[in-house]
UniProtKB/Swiss-Prot annotation:
One of its GO terms (cellular component) is chromocenter. The gene is MBD5. The keyword Nucleus applies. The lineage of its organism: Eukaryota, Metazoa, Chordata, Craniata, Vertebrata. It comes from Homo sapiens (Human). This is Methyl-CpG-binding domain protein 5. It is linked to Intellectual developmental disorder, autosomal dominant 1: A disorder characterized by significantly below average general intellectual functioning associated with impairments in adaptive behavior and manifested during the developmental period. Named 'methyl-CpG-binding domain protein' for homology to other methyl-CpG-binding domain proteins and the presence of an MBD domain, MBD5 and MBD6 may have evolutionarily lost the ability to bind methylated DNA and are recruited to heterochromatin by alternative signals. Residues 1483-1494 have a biased composition (Basic residues). Changing A857T: In MRD1; uncertain significance. One of its GO terms (biological process) is nervous system development.
Length: 1494
C-alpha cells in the first residue's frame, strides 16, 4: 500500500524546496530522510508511499489541500525548506485530529484490535521483506498488504535488508509498516538503524512528537514503532510502538493520535535529547537524539539513534509503506490478521502470537496483535521496540529522564488503542525505561501501562505501567522486559528474542533464530545493557538486571552482539538490522543452537531486546560481551543500545570523569564513538567481523558488538586514537584507546574494563578505551553496576555484570572493578578473545581470573556465565579474576583484550590477529552460552593470543602491546581493586603498566602485565624470582620487566600470589602456575582452591586462567578447570609444583613450539622476540626454545634430539599436540617455562628440550629453569589443570602429564600429530589456524604423535569443546581453532580445546610429578595405540583424582564439578579425545592429569 514503493530512503523523494506541511500532518526529517506522518499516524517516507497511501482506502487524508499536488505538499527532500509551523498550525493539527474520524477511529480501533488482533504481529513479521510491519498493517487489505508487502519487502529489502539486513530492521520495518511507521516508523526504524541520530532528530523531532494524530509523539518518541503503529491505527501502531520500545510504547500509550501530548511527553522524554525522538524513537528518534545528545546525555536515544542510523535503511519505509497501508487501514482492517499470520510465519520465531514473532510483544503481543494490524506491528514492532525502545528505554531511561517522559507520554495517551502494543512497548519501555528509577516513574506508569496496556490499551498507563514496571523491571530484567520483558512471561523466548533480536533482525526467521539465539545471548546482553541503563535508574532494576540480566542479559549480550555483529557484518554501513537479518539468521541459527538460553534469551531478549539492547547489546558487549555495550550500538538494538550506551556513557562519563581525567576526551570521543558506534556499529562490527570475524564473527556478539561499537565509535568518532582505522574497529579503537593511554592503562584499564563493558557497548573499543578514562568511571558507580548488569559487559556482561556487580561493587574502584569484572566476564570472552588474538595478554588474562592472584577472585571468576562468559566473579581475586575476566570477552575482556591486543595489534600490526581473536572470542562468548564455549573461546582467544603473544615475543612492540593489553587487563584488575591482593597486583600491574605504558615496546613491559598477572598466579615465582630475575636479566625485554615487575610485583609477589619475580612472560606462565603455587602460592592455592570449591559448590563455573607468558598467556579456565587447578593447587604446593613443573615442562615445550610456529610464521622476528618474549621463559630456556622453536622444524621438534628429543619429543609432542591445539603459544611458553623449571633436572628437561631441539646446555638451562619452576610447576599444574587443554600439550610433553594429555587427546590427536600438518586434521580447528598452528607447532608435531599440532583429537577436542560450548556454532569452532594459535610461548593455556578432557599432571604429589616428568619421558609419549577415549581418560582421571585427593585437597564440590565436567566432556567429546592408554594408565596414578573437560 503506502509502502507500495517505499523508497529505501524516505528522503529519497526530495520534494520541492519549500513545503508546507498539511494541517494535521507532520513532516519529520531524520537521518533516514523525510517522513510524513498522516493524521492517522501513518508514516510516509517517499512519494511512492504517499501515493500508495492516498490511493489506499481507509487512509486518513485529512488536512491535505484540495488541489493536492503531491510534489508540492509532500517534499521528501531533507534539505527542503519547510514552512515553519505556527501555533495555529499546531492547533489545526489538533483540530484535524479531533475532526478526523481516522484519528479517532485509529485510537478506537487500535484499542479494539489490540484485544482482537493478536495475529497481526505475525502478519507484520510475516511480511517477508521486512514489511512484516506493513503486512500486519495491511492485513485488512489483503491485496494492499500484499502489494505493500511486496513493496515493503522491496523497500525493506532494499532499505532494510540491503541497508541493514537485520531482522531488526525488518522488524522495525515490519513494525513500521505495521503501524505507525508507515513512513515514519520505517524511516524511524531505519533511521534508527541507519541514522539513529538523524532519525532521532527527525523522528524524535518534535514534529514527530507533535503529530498528535500520528502520535506525533510516538513518531518522536518511539518513532518507528509508535509512528507506524499510530499511523495506521493506534492499535496497530501501538503494538508496534510498544514493541518498538518504551518510547514508542509511550507514544503508543498515548494513542498515536496523542500527537500533541505524545509529542509533548515525547519531547519531554526526549527533552534531554531530541524532544520526541528520544522517547519516541526509542530507537530511531531516540537514536537521533541519542546520537545528537548521546554525548551530552547518556541517552538511550543516543544509542537508539545509533541503532537507527545504523539501520539506516530509510527504506524501512517500504515496510512502513506497507504498514501505512495496513496502518492506514489499521483501524479499518483490524483484519489484516490474515497477512499477519504470514508475518507470524515469517516471524515464526515469534513467541506466541504472530505479533510476537519477534517475541518482543510476547506479553502484549496477543492483545496488540489482536488489536489490529498495528498489533502485528507490535510484533514486528515489538522486535523493533525491543530493539529500539528497549534499547532506548534501557538506554534512554538511564540516559534521560525522557524515558519517564516517554512513559508519561504513554500515560498521556493511555486510551489509545495501541495500548496492547503499548503494553508491549511499555514493557519494553518499562523494562528499559524502568531501568532508570527516575524515569521509571513515568516509564513505569507508561511502560507498565503500555506493557499492561495489552489488556486494556487505555488501561491506566500509570497503573499498567507501574505494574509493568514492577513486573518488567525485575523479571524482564529491564531490557528483556522492556518490550516483552516487562512481562516476564511475555518475555517468552520469542518475545524477548523477538524483541531484541527481531528488532535487530528484520526477518522473523532471523529474528526468531537470532532472537532465540539472542534470547539467551542478546537478552543477557540486553539485560545487561538494560541493567546498565536501568541500574542507574533503578536500583531494583539493576538487581533484576544482575539476576535476570545475568541469565538473560548474558544471552542478550552475547546474542545481541551476535545479532548486531551479524548485522554489522552484513551491513558494513549501518543496517544492523539488515545485516542481522542475513548474518544474524545464519549465525543466530547456529547461535540458537548454541544458545540453549534462547528461550531465556528470548525472554531477556524481549526485554533487553525490547530495549533494543539485544542488538544493541550485541554491539555493545560482547561479545563479550555484550561484547555489549557495543551491543547498544548494534543495529536496531542500537537504538536501545545507543540509549543504553548513552546512559552508560553518561554514567561512564561521570565515573570516568571522576575516574579518568584524560579520557574525558576519550569519553567524549567514546561518547561520540558510541554515538557513532550506534550509528555505525554495524559497519564497525561488520568490519570487525570481516576483519577478524572470519571464523566467529558473531560468536561473541558482545565482542563483535563491542568491536562494532568500537569500530563505529572508531569509525564515527575515531574516538580511539589510532583505533579508528583498525578494521577491528573495536580492537583498534579499544586498542588505540588503550594504547592511547597505556600509561593510563591502570586508570584506563580500570575504566576500560568497566567502561569497556558499559561503554564498551557503544564502543567496545572506544568504549573500552574511552571507557578507559571516562566510560569505565561513568559506570564505576552506578553505571558499573548497570554495565555489569547490562550487557555492557558484553556477553559476560550479564554474568559479569551480575558477578561484577556482586563481585566488585565495592567502591568506585570496586565499581570499576565490578564493572571490570562484568566487563571482564565479557572481557574474558570478549576482551579475552581480543587479547588472545592480540597476544593473549588480555585473553589469557581473562582466564587468569580464577587462578588470579587472589584465589577468591579465582573463585569468583568461576562464574562462567551461562553465556560462557566466564564471569569469573573473582571476588577474592578481582585482579586476577578481573584480569582474566577483564579480558573476558565481553567488553572489558574483549574490549580489553581487544583493546589491548588491538592496541598492540593495532600498533603492532596485530589488529587482525586480535580481531580474529576477538572474533574468536566473540563466538566463544556467544556460544559460551555455555561456559564451555566461553572457555573454549577464551582458550581460543588465548591461543590466538598466544600466537599474538608469540608475536609479541617476536615483536617487542607487540609484546609491549600485549603487555599493554595485559596491563589493561591488569588495570582491569586494578579496576577491581576490591581485592587487596588484586589491588596490590593492580599496583604492580599498574606499575608494570606504567612501565609498559612507558615502554610499551619493551618486551619486559609486554611481559609485565602478563607477568604481573601470572605472577599473581605464580606464587612460586618468588622462589623462581632469582632465576626469573636471572632469566629476565638474560632476557633483554624481561630484564626490565623483572626489575619493574619484580620491583612492583615483589610486594604483591607473596600477597597477590606471585606478582613478584615471575615477571617475564615465561614466568607469566609459571606465574600462572605459580599463582597457585609458591609459598604464598600455597596459601594462594588454598585460597584459590577454597574459592574455587566455594564457587563450585555454589555451582559457579570457575575460570582459571593460566598464562605462561605474562604477555600472552592468560588463559581462562573453566570452572572445572579452575577447580582442577585448585585441586592441583590444593595438593602439595610442591606436588602441584611438580605436576605443574611437568606440565610446564611439557607446556613450555608447547609454548616453545607455539613460539616456533610463530617464528616460522614470523621468521626472524619471532626469534628475536623469542629472545625477548621467549626470554620471558628464560634466556637459556628461551635460547633452547628459540633453537627448537625458531629454528627447529617439526623434525627437530619431533625428535631432532633423538635421545632426549625422542622421549621429550614424545612428551613434548603430546604436549604440543594439545598445546598445538590448546596452547600452541602456551606450549611454547610452557616449554620455556619448563626450561625455566628444571623440574626434571636433566632428563625430563632434555626430554622436553629435544623436542625443542635445544642444545644440552639449553636443556641444562631449561632444567635449571625447570627447577626454578618446580614450585611454579605446582602452580602451573594448577594452571594446567585450569588450562587443561593447554596443558594438554604440556601434559603431552610431560611424561605423565603428557600421557594424561595424550589420553585426553584421543588417538585422533595422535593421528593429528601424525598428520601434524593437515589443517583439516583438526576437526574444529580452523584450517588456517591449524595450518599456522601446524606450521609452527605442527612441524615438530608431524613426527610426534602428540605434537603441538592440533591433532584430530586435539581438533576434536576443540571441536567437542566447541560442541560442548556451541556445537552448532561454527564460529565457536573456528574460535576454538583460533585459540591454539593465540597462545603464546610459555602460555599455560587451559587447552580449552574441546577435546581437552584431562590434565595429565593435574594433581600429583611432587614426587609423582617429578617422577612423572622424569620417569615418564616415554609416558609423555603418546602413542596412538595408547590413546584412550575421553571416557577412559576421564575414568583414569577420576581415579587419579580420587587418589590425588589425598595429596590434593579436592573438595567434594570441586570433585563433583569435575566429575560432571568430565562426564559432560565425555558426552560431548566422547571419543574425541582418546587418551593414550599408556598415558592414561600412567596418568591415573598421576592425579595431576585431572581431566577438566569443561
Amino acid at each position: 500500500m503506502n509502502g507500495g514503493k517505499e523508497c529505501d530512503g524516505g528522503d529519497k523523494e526530495g520534494g520541492l524546496p519549500a513545503i508546507q506541511v498539511p494541517v494535521g500532518w507532520q513532516r519529520r526529517v531524520d537521518q533516514n530522510g523525510v517522513l510524513y506522518v498522516s493524521p492517522s499516524g501513518s508514516l510516509l517516507s517517499c512519494l511512492e508511499q504517499v501515493k500508495t497511501y492516498l490511493l489506499t482506502d481507509g487512509t486518513c487524508k485529512c488536512g491535505l489541500e484540495c488541489p493536492l499536488i503531491l510534489p508540492k505538499v509532500f517534499n521528501f527532500d531533507p534539505g527542503a525548506a519547510v514552512k515553519q509551523r505556527t501555533a495555529e498550525d499546531v492547533k489545526a493539527d489538533e483540530d484535524v485530529t479531533k475532526l478526523c474520524i481516522h484519528k479517532r477511529k485509529i485510537i478506537a480501533v487500535a484499542t479494539l484490535h489490540k484485544s482482537m488482533e493478536a495475529p497481526h504481529p505475525s502478519l507484520v513479521l510475516t511480511s517477508p521483506g521486512g514489511g512484516t510491519n506493513a503486512t500486519p498493517v495491511v492485513p485488512s487489505r489483503a491485496a494492499t498488504p500484499r502489494s505493500v508487502r511486496n513493496k515493503s519487502h522491496e523497500g525493506i529489502t532494499n532499505s532494510v535488508m540491503p541497508e541493514c539486513k537485520n531482522p531488526f530492521k525488518l522488524m522495525i520495518g515490519s513494525s513500521n509498516a505495521m503501524g505507525r511507521l508507515y513512513v515514519q516508523e520505517l524511516p524511524g526504524s531505519q533511521q534508527q538503524e541507519l541514522h539513529p541520530v538523524y532519525p532521532r532528530q527527525r523522528l524524535g523531532s518534535s514534529e514527530h512528537g507533535q503529530k498528535s494524530p500520528f502520535r506525533g509523539s510516538h513518531g518522536g518518541l518511539p518513532s518507528p514503532a509508535s509512528s507506524g503503529s499510530q499511523i495506521y491505527g493506534d492499535g496497530s501502531i501501538s503494538p508496534r510502538t510498544d514493541p518498538l520500545g518504551s518510547p514508542d510504547v509511550f507514544t503508543r500509550s498515548n494513542p498515536g493520535f496523542h500527537g500533541a501530548p505524545n509529542s509533548s511527553p515525547i519531547h519531554l522524554n526526549r527533552t534531554p535529547l531530541s524532544p520526541p525522538s528520544v522517547m519516541l524513537h526509542g530507537s530511531p528518534v531516540q537514536s537521533s537524539c541519542a546520537m545528537a545528545g548521546r554525548t551530552n546525555i547518556p541517552l538511550s536515544p543516543t544509542l537508539t539513534t545509533k541503532s537507527p542510523v545504523m539501520k539506516k535503511p530509510m527504506c524501512n519505509f517500504s515496510t512502513n509503506m506497507e504498514i501505512p497501508r495496513a496502518m492506514f487501514h489499521h483501524k479499518p482492517p483490524q483484519g489484516p490478521p490474515p497477512p499477519p499470520p504470514p508475518s507470524c510465519a515469517l516471524q515464526k520465531k515469534p513467541l506466541t502470537s504472530e505479533k510476537d514473532p519477534l517475541g518482543i510483544l510476547d506479553p502484549i503481543p496477543s492483545k496488540p496483535v489482536n488489536q489490529n494490524p498495528v498489533i502485528i506491528n507490535p510484533t514486528s514492532f515489538h522486535s523493533n521496540v525491543h530493539s529500539q525502545v528497549p534499547m532506548m528505554n534501557v538506554s534512554m531511561p538511564p540516559a534521560v529522564v525522557p524515558l519517564p517522559s516517554n512513559l508519561p507520554l504513554p500515560t498521556v495517551k493511555p486510551g489509545h488503542m495501541n495500548h496492547g502494543s503499548h503494553v508491549q512497548r511499555v514493557q519494553h519501555s518499562a523494562s528499559t525505561s524502568l531501568s532508570p528509577s527516575p524515569v521509571t516513574s513515568p516509564v513505569h506508569m507508561m511502560g507498565t501501562g503500555i506493557g499492561r496496556i495489552e489488556a486494556s490499551p487505555q488501561r491506566s498507563r500509570s497503573s499498567s505501567t507501574s505494574s509493568d514496571h514492577g513486573n518488567f523491571m525485575m523479571p524482564p530484567v529491564g531490557p528483556q522486559a522492556t518490550s516483552s520483558g516487562i512481562k516476564v512471561p511475555p518475555r517468552s523466548p520469542r518475545s524477548t528474542i523477538g524483541s531484541p533480536r527481531p528488532s535487530m533482525p528484520s526477518s522473523p526467521s532471523t529474528k526468531s533464530d537470532g532472537h532465540h539465539q539472542y534470547k539467551d545471548i542478546p537478552n543477557p546482553l540486553i539485560a545487561g545493557i538494560s541493567n546498565v541503563l536501568n541500574t542507574p535508574s533503578s536500583a531494583a532494576f539493576p538487581t533484576a538486571s544482575a539476576g535476570s540480566s545475568s541469565v538473560k542479559s548474558q544471552p542478550g549480550l552475547l546474542g545481541m552482539p551476535l545479532n548486531q555483529i551479524l548485522n554489522q557484518h552484513n551491513a558494513a554501513s549501518f543496517p544492523a538490522s539488515s545485516l542481522l537479518s542475513a548474518a544474524a539468521k545464519a549465525q543466530l541459527a547456529n547461535q540458537n543452537k548454541l544458545a540453549g538460553n534462547n528461550s531465556s534469551s528470548s525472554s531477556n531478549s524481549g526485554a533487553v531486546a525490547g530495549s533494543g539492547n539485544t542488538e544493541g547489546h550485541s554491539t555493545l558487549n560482547t561479545m563479550f560481551p555484550p561484547t555489549a555495550n557495543m551491543l547498544l550500538p548494534t543495529g536496531e538494538g542500537q537504538s536501545g543500545r545507543a540509549a543504553l550506551r548513552d546512559k552508560l556513557m553518561s554514567q561512564q562519563k561521570d565515573a570516568l570523569r571522576k575516574r579518568k581525567q584524560p579520557p574525558t576526551t576519550v569519553l567524549s570521543l567514546l561518547r561520540q564513538s558510541q554515538m557513532d558506534s550506534s550509528a555505525v556499529p554495524k559497519p564497525g562490527p561488520d568490519l570487525l567481523r570481516k576483519q577478524g570475524q572470519g571464523s566467529f564473527p558473531i560468536s561473541s556478539m558482545s565482542q563483535l558488538l563491542q568491536s562494532m561499537s568500537c569500530q563505529s565509535s572508531h569509525l564515527s568518532s575515531n574516538s580511539t586514537p589510532g583505533c579508528g582505522a583498525s578494521n577491528t574497529a573495536l580492537p583498534c579503537s579499544a586498542n588505540q584507546l588503550h594504547f592511547t593511554d597505556p600509561s593510563m592503562n591502570s586508570s584506563v584499564l580500570q575504566n576500560i574494563p568497566l567502561r569497556g563493558e558499559a561503554v564498551h557497548c557503544h564502543n567496545a573499543n572506544t568504549n573500552f578505551v574511552h571507557s578507559n578514562s571516562p566510560v569505565p568511571n561513568h559506570h564505576l558507580a552506578g553505571l558499573i553496576n548497570q554495565i555489569q548488569a547490562s550487557g555492557n559487559c558484553g556477553m559476560l556482561s550479564q554474568s559479569g555484570m551480575a558477578l561484577g556487580n556482586s563481585l566488585h561493587p565495592n567502591p568506585p574502584q570496586s565499581r570499576i572493578s565490578t564493572s571490570s569484572t562484568p566487563v571482564i566476564p565479557n572481557s574474558i570472552v570478549s576482551s579475552y578473545n581480543q587479547t588472545s588474538s592480540e597476544a593473549g595478554g588480555s585473553g589469557p588474562s581473562s582466564s587468569i581470573a580464577i587462578a588470579g592472584t587472589n584465589h577468591p577472585a579465582i573463585t569468583k571468576t568461576t562464574s562462567v556465565l551461562q553465556d560462557g562468559v566466564i564471569v569469573t566473579t573473582a571476588a577474592g581475586n578481582p585482579l586476577q579474576s578481573q584480569l582474566p575476566i577483564g579480558s573476558d570477552f565481553p567488553f572489558v575482556g574483549q574490549e580489553h583484550a581487544l583493546h589491548f591486543p588491538s592496541n598492540s595489534t593495532s600498533n603492532n600490526h596485530l589488529p587482525h590477529p586480535l580481531n580474529p581473536s576477538l572474533l574468536s572470542s566473540l563466538p566463544i562468548s556467544l556460544p559460551v552460552n555455555q561456559q564451555h564455549l566461553l572457555n573454549q573461546n577464551l582458550l581460543n582467544i588465548l591461543q590466538p593470543s598466544a600466537g599474538e603473544g608469540d608475536m609479541s615475543s617476536i615483536n617487542n612492540t607487540l609484546s609491549n602491546h600485549q603487555l599493554t593489553h595485559l596491563q589493561s587487563l591488569l588495570n582491569n584488575n586494578q579496576m577491581f581493586p576490591p581485592n587487596q591482593q588484586q589491588q596490590q597486583l593492580l599496583q604492580g600491574y599498574q606499575n608494570l603498566q606504567a612501565f609498559q605504558g612507558q615502554s610499551t615496546i619493551p618486551c619486559p613491559a609486554n611481559n609485565n602485565p602478563m607477568a604481573c598477572l601470572f605472577q599473581n598466579f605464580q606464587v612460586r615465582m618468588q622462589e623462581d624470582a632469582a632465576l626469573l630475575n636471572k632469566r629476565i636479566s638474560t632476557q633483554p625485554g624481561l630484564t626490565a620487566l623483572p626489575e619493574n615487575p619484580n620491583t612492583t610485583l615483589p610486594p604483591f609477589q607473596d600477597t597477590p600470589c606471585e606478582l613478584q619475580p615471575r615477571i617475564d612472560p615465561s614466568l607469566g606462565q609459571q606465574v600462572k602456575d605459580g599463582l597457585v603455587v609458591g609459598g604464598p602460592g600455597d596459601a594462594s592455592v588454598d585460597a584459590i582452591y577454597k574459592a574455587v570449591v566455594d564457587a563450585a559448590s555454589k555451582g559457579m563455573q570457575v575460570v582459571i586462567t593460566t598464562a605462561v607468558n605474562s604477555t600472552t598467556q592468560i588463559s581462562p579456565i573453566p570452572a572445572l578447570s579452575a577447580m582442577s587447578a585448585f585441586t592441583a593447587s590444593i595438593g602439595d604446593p610442591l606436588n602441584l609444583s611438580s605436576a605443574v613443573s611437568a606440565v610446564i615442562h611439557g607446556r613450555n615445550m608447547g609454548g616453545v613450539d607455539h613460539d616456533g610456529r610463530l617464528r616460522n610464521s614470523r621468521g626472524a622476528r619471532l626469534p628475536k622476540n623469542l629472545d625477548h618474549g621467549k626470554n620471558v621463559n628464560e634466556g637459556d630456556g628461551f635460547e633452547y626454545f628459540k633453537s627448537a622453536s625458531c629454528h627447529t622444524s617439526k623434525k627437530q621438534w619431533d625428535g631432532e634430539q633423538s635421545p632426549r628429543g625422542e622421549r621429550n619429543r614424545w612428551k613434548y609432542e603430546e604436549f604440543l599436540d594439545h598445546p598445538g591445539h590448546i596452547h600452541s603459544s602456551p606450549c611454547h611458553e610452557r616449554p620455556n617455562n619448563v626450561s625455566t623449571l628444571p623440574f626434571l633436572p636433566g632428563e625430563q628437561h632434555p626430554i622436553l628440550l629435544p623436542p625443542r631441539n635445544c642444545p644440552g646446555d639449553k636443556i641444562l638451562e631449561e632444567n635449571f629453569r625447570y627447577n626454578n619452576y618446580k614450585r611454579t610447576m605446582m602452580s602451573f599444574k594448577e594452571r594446567l589443570e585450569n588450562t587443561v587443554e593447554r596443558c594438554a600439550h604440556i601434559n603431552g610433553n610431560r611424561p605423565r602429564q603428557s600421557r594424561g594429555f595424550g589420553e585426553l587427546l584421543s588417538t585422533a590427536k595422535q593421528d593429528l600429530v601424525l598428520e601434524e600438518q593437515s589443517p583439516s586434521s583438526s576437526n574444529s580447528l580452523e584450517n588456517s589456524l591449524v595450518k599456522d598452528y601446524i606450521h609452527y607447532n605442527g612441524d615438530f608435531n608431524a613426527k610426534s604423535v602428540n605434537g603441538c599440532v592440533p591433532s584430530p583429537s586435539d581438533a576434536k577436542s576443540i571441536s567437542s569443546e566447541d560442541d560442548l560450548r556451541n556445537p552448532d556454532s561454527p564460529s565457536s569452532n573456528e574460535l576454538i581453532h583460533y585459540r591454539p594459535r593465540t597462545f603464546n610461548v610459555g602460555d599455560l593455556v587451559w587447552g580449552q580445546i574441546k577435546g581437552l578432557t584431562s590434565w595429565p599432571g593435574k594433581l600429583v604429589r611432587e614426587d609423582d610429578v617429578h617422577n612423572s616428568c622424569q620417569q615418564s619421558p616415554e609416558e609423555g609419549k603418546v602413542e596412538p595405540e595408547k590413546l584412550k577415549t575421553l571416557t577412559e581418560g576421564l575414568e583414569a582421571y577420576s581415579r587419579v583424582r580420587k587418589r590425588n585427593r589425598k595429596s590434593g585437597k579436592l573438595n567434594n564440590h570441586l570433585e563433583a564439578a569435575i566429575h560432571e565436567a568430565m562426564s559432560e566432556l565425555d558426552k560431548m567429546s566422547g571419543t574425541v579425545h582418546q587418551i593414550p592408554q599408556g598415558d592414561r594408565q600412567m596418568r591415573p596414578p598421576k592425579p595431576k592429569r585431572r581431566k577438566i573437560s569443561r
